């Protein structure tokens, strides 16, 4: 298929659609067909075709079988090309396969619109015209101007800017799910779109914007009054900060926090953004961002685990959480501490920082009868493994030979394990030995 030739045909799609509409109106078609034509004219950003239909009393508020109004269609991304095929085969079947392939790679939220377009054009066109009409057009800069003009026409006809489709999405949801929808979002907000409205799944426009990873779009919504603690999903109770952290987007997470997002907010299972960041080895900067902005390192989710439980496989994460006061002796609902919950104890570097922390905490108590239950469990675990016992003895010797003021981050690494392990930068809030 000659992709260049097909793209060249695309330039005529506006005039073809306009002629179809003129002929269709003359034939007095059903309301359903006129409604499809309006959606298609809007999807292709054909302002003259839209005006022609509305001037002939086509209802701009009419919805399709998916609950989509013409305003929803407008705020969805314009058609764009996804596939290039090298071999040209001049028959309609191949053309249709090309469209199907492109549909499969399109966003499902609006792919059905193109299916209806295909059916409609096959009713009105000759076979040799199908390829011209079905070719998916590229987005041109002028289209953005047409989008605003079309929206103004629709709004002047009284269309409800907050009308929901069959899954509760408004036009603003769709516009925020579209990386190039900045002008559309601004115009919707200017005309009264509800910024914090949720769809049937508890997703807000801000959550859609966060998912697109477009910080400019997120900033527009926050500056316009979007709730930084708004919902991403009502089924599991996640908020937009969970989504930003889960996708590893530092800049958006920072923007949300600076706008008032709560770093300790939990989902239905009590999982906080800090729990989420602690799991992902690539989210160290996010972990530090959350801790710097008041995230509680000892907050528990419904199963009793803290972020330290999720971070125990990673030395740097454990070190960072200890710096901010994470408690190694907390016990979860299964009776485990973060240390006893480990599957193995083969990582000597990780063992060194954990056991030193445990030994420092033990030093705070003059009598075993006052040991916290979690500390007892951790000490029992150490005693049951020879390599852990050897590490504990070295830590005890280090602590015994040092004064309280000397047990600080940069002074212990060269002495523990004969400089074998790099503990530079480590410090503990529990190092205040009396």
Swiss-Prot record:
Asked if the record carries the keyword Metal-binding, the reply is no
State whether keyword Repeat applies: yes
Mind listing the UniProt keywords for this protein, alphabetically?
ANK repeat, Repeat
The ANK repeat units are at 33-62, 134-163, 167-197, 201-230, 236-265, 269-299, 303-330
Q: Which Pfam families match?
A: Ank (PF00023), Ank_2 (PF12796)
Q: Which PANTHER family match?
A: MOLTING PROTEIN MLT-4 (PTHR24178)
What is the name listed in the Swiss-Prot or TrEMBL entry for this protein? Putative ankyrin repeat protein FPV023
């Amino acid at each position: 298929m000659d992709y260049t030739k097909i793209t060249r045909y695309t330039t005529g799609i506006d005039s073809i659609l306009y002629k179809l509409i003129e002929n269709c109106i003359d034939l007095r078609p059903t309301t359903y067909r006129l409604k499809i034509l309006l959606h298609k004219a809007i999807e292709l950003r054909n302002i003259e075709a839209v005006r022609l239909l509305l001037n002939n009393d086509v209802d701009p508020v009419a919805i399709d079988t998916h609950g989509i109004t013409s305003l929803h269609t407008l705020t969805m991304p314009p058609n764009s090309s996804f596939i290039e095929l090298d071999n040209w085969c001049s028959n309609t079947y191949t053309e249709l396969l090309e469209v199907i392939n492109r549909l499969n790679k399109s966003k499902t939220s609006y792919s059905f619109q193109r299916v209806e377009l295909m059916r409609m054009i096959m009713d009105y066109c000759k076979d040799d015209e199908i390829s011209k009409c079905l070719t998916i057009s590229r987005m041109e800069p002028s289209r953005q101007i047409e989008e605003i003009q079309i929206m103004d026409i629709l709004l002047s006809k009284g269309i409800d800017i907050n009308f929901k489709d069959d899954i509760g999405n408004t036009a603003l949801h769709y516009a925020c799910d579209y990386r190039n929808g900045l002008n559309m979002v601004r115009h919707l907000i200017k005309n009264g779109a509800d910024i914090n409205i949720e769809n049937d799944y508890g997703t807000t426009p801000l959550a859609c914007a966060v998912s697109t990873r477009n910080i400019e779009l997120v900033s527009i919504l926050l500056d316009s009054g979007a709730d930084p603690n708004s919902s991403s999903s009502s089924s599991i109770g996640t908020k937009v900060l969970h989504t930003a952290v889960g996708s590893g987007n530092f800049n958006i997470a920072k923007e949300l926090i600076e706008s008032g997002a709560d770093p300790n907010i939990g989902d239905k299972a009590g999982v906080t953004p800090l729990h989420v960041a602690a799991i992902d080895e690539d989210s160290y900067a996010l972990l530090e961002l959350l801790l710097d902005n008041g995230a509680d390192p000892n907050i528990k989710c419904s199963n009793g685990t803290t972020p330290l439980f999720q971070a125990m496989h990673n030395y740097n994460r454990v070190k960072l959480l200890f710096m901010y006061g994470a408690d190694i002796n907390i016990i979860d609902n299964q009776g485990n501490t973060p240390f006893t919950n480990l599957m193995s104890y083969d990582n000597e570097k990780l063992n060194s920082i954990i056991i030193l922390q445990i030994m420092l905490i033990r030093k705070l108590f003059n009598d075993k009868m006052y040991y916290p239950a979690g500390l007892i469990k951790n000490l029992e675990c150490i005693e049951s493994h020879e390599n852990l016992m050897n590490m504990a003895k070295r830590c005890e010797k280090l602590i015994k030979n040092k004064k309280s003021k000397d047990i600080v981050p940069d002074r212990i690494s060269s002495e523990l394990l004969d400089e074998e392990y790099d503990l530079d930068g480590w410090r503990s809030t529990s190092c205040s030995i009396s």
